Amino acid sequence: MSHTILLVQPGARPETRTYCDYESVNECMEGVCKIYEEHLKRRNPNTPTITYDISQLFDFIDTMVDISCMVYQKSTNTYAPYNKDWIKEKIYVLLRQAAFSSNT
């Protein structure tokens, strides 16, 4: 488990910048999914169930002006930066594992 900081800038203005911290990379990726789910709920307030596929999630990530992670590296006692593509790859792996687990 590596402490992970999610840095998000959804809009062009610097005031839209925010961050969240998580105890692990997987927890952070779940957090990104939750951000998207909250976005969908705001856009569709009368829809009782929110569904989406991974391509829609990735499109949402791509609309962000900036989204990146800083992941703690125990060996160097520093945080390493990771970009949108890395985040999408980690989300893909997480969701694939979740789908595999639910099918067994």
UniProtKB/Swiss-Prot annotation:
GO terms for cellular component: nucleus. The modification Phosphothreonine is found at residue 18. Acts as an enhancer of the rudimentary gene. Has a role in pyrimidine biosynthesis and the cell cycle. Keywords: Cell cycle, Phosphoprotein, Pyrimidine biosynthesis. The modification Phosphoserine is found at residue 24. Coiled coil: none annotated. The keyword Phosphoprotein applies. Belongs to the E(R) family. This is Protein enhancer of rudimentary. It comes from the Eukaryota. InterPro entries: EHR_sf (IPR035912), ERH (IPR000781). One of its GO terms (biological process) is pyrimidine nucleotide biosynthetic process. Pfam families: ER (PF01133). It comes from Drosophila melanogaster (Fruit fly). Phosphorylated in vitro by casein kinase II (CK2).
